[in-house]
Amino acid sequence: LRCQVGVPAEERAEPQNLLAHLTLDVADFPTDDEIGQTVDYKTVSDQVRELVGRGERQLIETLAQEIARHVLAEFPVNAIRVELEKFILPETDWVGVVIERKRGERI
């Protein structure tokens, strides 16, 4: 994902790459082998990409929360796990955050 995220303004000045892992607990499993009976992951991906591209954020925690809130509101899932990896610190492979949210939780 390309987005502008970081605490210092210079870090947010240019878009950077994030890696996102989304794990969804789907509400109902399909009875037939039809995409219309479940979550369309392409649509989820497209909407998350569009959401991430809107504006700047200081914290990847905020971004993870926005992603979880959006997916729970727009798709038939009971829960979501969002993991974001950011490749900004030279002495690390990546830094990141993991959140898990359930439908009905206050988020």
Regions found by a protein language model. Name each.
Residues L1-I107:
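N-terminal, polar/charged subdomain of small-to-medium soluble alpha/beta proteins
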